[in-house]
Amino acid sequence: MSATASTRRSGRRDDRPRGAARREALLEAVLKVVADVGADAVTHRRVAEVADLPLASTTYWFDSKEQLLTAALELAAARDIARLQEFAAEPPEDFIDPLDLAVAAILEPLDESLQASRGSLLATYLLLLEAARRPSLRGVAKEWTEAYLKLLGRLFKQAGSADPAADAELLLAAADGLLISQLAQGTGGDLGPGLRRLAGALVTG
């Protein structure tokens, strides 16, 4: 039976995603499951339920849980790396100081709604920590980190840093630590001023 005929008989449209969009919807579901209940809870069945898609769609695209987790981290990384590249190509006009830009590059995703950004952050950090015991995730984690360090290193160099690469690593590590602490404690707050002071202190020594 054709899809059109099926739709006519049922009297309703099936607006669920198909093709590549279906794959992306499944990966969005993986990220949601990770944020809600952790990476260990990711299964083909649970992902299909969260995505509101047939179970067969998960096994069509992904043979294993390892593939689900890796592809989900790849999706999150690709999106953020694209954001960083766009940020570097067209930095916000209201930022002139390179250290202000460095802090903004890290914290820009948090300008979205609080709930959405916290869920995204939690899924990201949980998957990055999974790389400690899942080697398949390490390549993505390294590529993602290097994208940040490349941009931050360039900005520290513009600011006159004596060791831009080391300063970039320290600023990124501090930001990660503070963000993880906020997630763990269920708190919020603007990390920008503190990170900016740290960036300035790194440059001035």
What are these regions (language model features)?
Residues 81-82, 115-125, 132-159, 166-169:
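Amphipathic alpha-helical packing segments from all-alpha helical-bundle domains
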Residues 25, 33-71:
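Helix-turn-helix
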Residues 137-138, 142, 146, 157-205:
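Hydrophobic/aromatic-rich alpha-helical bundle segments in the mid-to-C-terminal region
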